[in-house]
Structure formats: structure tokens, C-alpha cells
Amino acid sequence: MGKYYQIFFLLYLLCILYVISCGYINPYSPYSSPCLFAPIIGYLYMGGSLSSNSSNNNNNNNNNNNNNNNNNNNNNNNNNNKDSKLTENCNNNSSNNNSDNKSNIKNKQHHHHSNFRNRRGKSNNKNSSDNDDCTKCNKRHHTQSSSYDTSELHQSVSSGLGGSMGSGSQALTDIEKDINEFMNANPSHSLNKQQIQQQQQLQQQQQQLLKQQQQQQQQQQQQQQQQQQQQLEKQRKEQEETEKKKQLELQQQQQLQQQQQNGNGLIIEEDMMEGRILRNISKVYRDVNENQPKSYYDYEGYRINWKNVDRYEVIQKIGRGKYSEVFSGIDIETSDEVVIKVLKPVQKLKIQREIKILESLNGGPNIIPLLDSVKDQSSKVCSLVFPFVNKTDIRELVYTLDDYDIRYYIFELLKAIDYTHSKGIIHRDIKPLNIAIDHSKRKLSLIDWGLAEYYHPGKNYNVRVASRHYKPPELLVNMFDYDYSLDMWSLGCLFAGLILDRDPFFNGDNNNDQLLKIVKVLGTDDLFNFLDKFGLSLTDEQSSLIKPRQKSNWERFIPYENDDIAQPDAIDFLDKLLRYDPTERLTAKEAMKHPYFKDFNQSIL
């Protein structure tokens, strides 16, 4: 059997030489050479003598030796590949961690053989066979790389080296030291830490930015919600205001409609008409409208020819009234100064009446003419255009006017009133504010015809007209069939304020108090005579306020500084205007013939 073993040893030696010559194994590697020559060293150590065991034992020993050799080869290959991997990682400055380096060493250790053959210039067929071996090797070591078993490595190293290179644990610690030295010497490891820190900082910054963006979005959403709520609240308030305005407009329209119906004799309370003995009929101009065609006074069927408002330019506001606001403006086509009266939302019938009356009075003395009627098509606002008048309130001029000036302007006013009455029209709102005086030109104009009405004898009219301080007694006791004499009472109140330096002369707080103020001057005898004549009566409240009084003497109301103005003919003229009974008052024509105007009335005699 010793011969057979020698023959087997020679064959093994030849195989090793062939493997080395072919380049499959590097004999200079410190890890592979002990594995290749371990059997030879063992044979020489034993002196070439073998025990005379049975053939079966020899076969078993040979098999065990072969297995050990295979294990040693595998372990040496692993060690060799680890070394090559360490070298390759040092050259490439790998940035992987410790565990990744170990797994990469195991996964790449089997390409050492193919790389060695390539350096020797071998053919592609050999490379393909080597690749097949590497595939098998990879399959075998894939299970090993999943779990790094240090005990298996210890056994393989100790068995392969045969004790010549020390124990397996010492080899393992050497490898781990090399790996640790490599990792400590590798600068990419510290770079990885810096990169990780930078990435963490970037992530923190991104998170902060995201938080800031979210906060900004939340703030924007809150602001948008607040703005939406504010807009909704504003819209709600605007809607409430518009609804209130509409309700007020409806109420005003209903009141105006009721007043208009009362004024036209359509609705009159029956208890007020009971006991009427005599109907009031004007003693002048009573049949003017009856002698005219219906189209002359029928403002209900009158159609207004509205023109474009763009012709006029508004400059500034100069006044306001109950039913309108007044602005100064310019006629763009002629560059003339104008006055634009912007009408508030009122009953359409009232606007038609005012325009119709102004057309009827066009060209009259001291009556402001209507230039144009315009309408804004977008807003539907209606306006009346008049020539510009340098308006000065007559009350502002009272201290600059002398006796002659007062006579002159009252006479000019009577001209306008008489012309109005001659056209069958009652002004119904004569007061200082509706009299425009340009004293430098000595020009007077009667303005504001919004309450004017056509007169028809025996017709009932609305008693809610004229300003309180200039209301005649017939309006205060609800006498609906009044006539032109209403304007003459208002003129008397205005004249009393001028010559007696007391405006308003009858300064009542309400309608009943206004009647009481009149009674204190004119007494109760003439009042009761007036009421009895026309079958009128006082209300319970009026009866409780009014007590029997004598008529006052006009001279007691004259201030000493106005002796030159309040002359006897002026007092007589005033006394004939302020009468309870409308039939006893002077008409406009009669007033102009009064001796008070003897210096001016030659033209009308």
C-alpha cells in the first residue's frame, strides 16, 4: 500500500504543478501556498512511512484528507479574496460601512482566479469555464455571506494551515485588525458621517421650510376666511341698508300717493267733510284751467322727453331740499353755468307735475325757466337743469336792504305770483329759501316748483303742503278746498319777518302750536268766525290749547330800529294779507295796487 500512496502522492504533485503552470492558483500567495503544499509537508514530516492499516481505513483516511484539503482550499480562497478585497477597497476609497465591507469581501473573492488568468493571457474558453466555477462558488458562498460564522472560519484556517501559521482565532483577529485598520485609515468613512450629518441638516431645514410653508398657508387661509367673512358681513350690511332704503322709499311713496290722492280729492275722510256749510272758491282766476284743453293741465298723461345727461358736468353741491339736491354745473356745449337739480326717488307723477307746470310757466316774469330734463340711463336718476342764479337768501339781505329795496323786491315777487295764478297754478311753498335774489343785478327769481299744483274750483287738495311757519290757517284746520290765497298768506308771513325783524314771525313747534302762535297775534274772534262760515271745527287738542284772545296791535311788534321800514302803509298791507278767511285776503293783483307800492304800480294801473 505504501507504493500506491507514493504513486498517488506523485500524481498529486503533478496535478499541483499543472494547476500552477496553468495559472489557476498563485503559489506566491501566503494563503494558498500552505493549502497546496500541506500534504507534501505532512508526508515529509512523517518520513514517508505509513502504518499497515487495512485498506478500508486507508481509504477513509484518504477521503478525510481530501475533504480537509477541500476545506483548506476554500478557507484559503476566502482569505485570499478577503485580502484582495481589502486592497481593492483601499484603492477605490469605498464609503460603505463595516458590515458592507465584509459582505463585499465575501462576494468578490472568487474573481481572483479569473483575474490571475487574464494576466497570464489565457483564452476566452478558459475564462468561460472559470466563470462557471465562479458561479458555483458564488452559490456556495452566498449562504455563507448571509451569516458570518467565526467558528467555521476558525476550523478552516486551523485545518488548512496545519498549525504552521498559528491558531484559527489568531488568524481571525488578524483579519479583523486589518479590516479595522482599513476602516480607520479610510477617509471616506468620515466623509460618510459628514454627508449623513449634512443630509440630516438638510432634512431638518426642509422640515422647517415645510412647517413654515404650512404655517404661511394656514395664515393665508385664515386671512382669506377673515376677508370672506368681512365681505359677507359687508354685503349683509349693504343688503340690510338697501332693504331699509327700499322700505323707506316705499313708505314715502305710499305717503306721497296718499297725499296725492287726498290732494286730488280721491280720498277724503268723511267726518272732516261733515258739517261743511260753504265750499271755498277762489274769487280770481277760478276758471282758467276749465277754459284750457285737458292737455294743458293733465300731467298724469304727460310724457317727459328725457335727454342725455352727458351734456352737463357737475361742479359742486350748493344746496338740498326735501325732495332734491342742487348742484352747480356747466353746459359743455355752450360753456354756460347751470344749476342741476337732482331729484330723489319720488313718485313719478310728482316729477311729471313739476315739469309740466314749469313748461306752463315758461317765460313768466321772475320765474326761473326750465332749460332741460335729463336722465342717467345707468342709474335712472332724473335731473332738471336751470340757468345759474346768484342766489342770496332774502333774510341775509335784510340788514343791507332799505325801505325802497324791500318794496321793490316784494313787488317783483308779486309779479311772479300773479303770473302763476293767472296760469291757474298755486305755488304752495313760498318762503325765503325759494326766493333767489341777485342784489347786484337787482334780479329776483321764484324757484322750486315741486309742490305747485293746478287749481280747479271746488276740488279738494292735500293739506300737507307749504312749510310749517308759512302755512295758512285753512291748512291747519284741514280745509281741503283751498285756493290761490294760500300763497298770499305765505307772502304775508315773509313780509312780516322783513319789516318786523322777526323771522319766522309765527314760529310754531308743530301744526297745533303754529295755530296757537297765530291766535296769539290775530285773536280768536276772527278765527271762530272763519270756522263758522265754512263749517269747520278744531280738533280736541287744538280746542284745549286755544283760549279766547283779542287781536294784538301790530305796532307792538315793531322794533324801534325798524321805524323807517315798518311804516303805516306797510302795516296796513301786512294786515290785509294775514287774515283767517281766505276770501278776505288780498289777491296778488290787488296787492300790487296797494298804496304801499305807489312808486311801482303805475305800470299795472
Curated annotation (Swiss-Prot):
CDD domains given in the database record: STKc_CK2_alpha
Disulfide bonds: none
Localization annotation: Membrane
Chain intervals with Polar residues compositional bias: 144-155
Compositionally biased spans, kind Basic residues: 105-123
PANTHER family in alphabetical order: CASEIN KINASE II SUBUNIT ALPHA (PTHR24054), SERINE_THREONINE-PROTEIN KINASE DDB_G0286481-RELATED (PTHR24054:SF51)
Protein name, per record: Probable serine/threonine-protein kinase DDB_G0286481
Segments forming domain Protein kinase: 312-597
Source organism per UniProt: Dictyostelium discoideum
The reaction(s) this protein catalyses: L-seryl-[protein] + ATP = O-phospho-L-seryl-[protein] + ADP + H(+); L-threonyl-[protein] + ATP = O-phospho-L-threonyl-[protein] + ADP + H(+)
Segments of this protein annotated with the region Disordered: 54-170
Keyword Signal: no
GO MF annotation list: ATP binding; protein serine kinase activity; protein serine/threonine kinase activity
Main location: membrane
One Pfam family linked to the record: Pkinase
